[in-house]
């Protein structure tokens, strides 16, 4: 009997040791699961932040095409100048018109009126210059026809 009791007690001690090892493994799994959960939460936050950033980049890129078109339109006016115009100085591209978006902004109205006046003056100067060029061309043609007569 003594031997049976010893066998039972060693068997019980062995099972207790196995259960302790299993408990340690489960505690370790729980610890690693907690760490993994924290890392996944951090990853989620970073992905949300990246998603917001990509939305901002997408907005900028969608507007970039409009910026390029505006610059292109402003530069088209440079094509009408001749080499003589470049001798006095490089001509500037066409002015871009600003459109007021806020109706309650009085300062914006003043700025817009000033810009419109400058644009009108610029257009008037351009038209006067063009009519002057046309008059000079007509005078040349008249002089040439008078020599041929």
Swiss-Prot record:
Residues 107-140 have a biased composition (Acidic residues). InterPro entries: DASH_Dad2. Residues 7-56 form a coiled coil. Keywords: Cell cycle, Cell division, Centromere, Chromosome, Chromosome partition, Coiled coil, Cytoplasm, Cytoskeleton, Kinetochore, Microtubule, Mitosis, Nucleus. Pfam families: DASH_Dad2. It is found in: Nucleus; Cytoplasm, Cytoskeleton, Spindle; Chromosome, Centromere, Kinetochore. Signal peptide: none annotated. Residues 107-149 are annotated as: Disordered. The keyword ATP-binding does not apply. One of its GO terms (biological process) is attachment of spindle microtubules to kinetochore. One of its GO terms (cellular component) is microtubule. Component of the DASH complex consisting of ASK1, DAD1, DAD2, DAD3, DAD4, DAM1, DUO1, HSK3, SPC19 and SPC34, with a stoichiometry of one copy of each subunit per complex. Multiple DASH complexes oligomerize to form a ring that encircles spindle microtubules and organizes the rod-like NDC80 complexes of the outer kinetochore. DASH complex oligomerization strengthens microtubule attachments. On cytoplasmic microtubules, DASH complexes appear to form patches instead of rings. Component of the DASH complex that connects microtubules with kinetochores and couples microtubule depolymerisation to chromosome movement; it is involved in retrieving kinetochores to the spindle poles before their re-orientation on the spindle in early mitosis and allows microtubule depolymerization to pull chromosomes apart and resist detachment during anaphase. Belongs to the DASH complex DAD2 family. This is DASH complex subunit DAD2. It comes from Debaryomyces hansenii (strain ATCC 36239 / CBS 767 / BCRC 21394 / JCM 1990 / NBRC 0083 / IGC 2968). The lineage of its organism: Eukaryota, Fungi, Dikarya, Ascomycota, Saccharomycotina. The gene is DAD2.
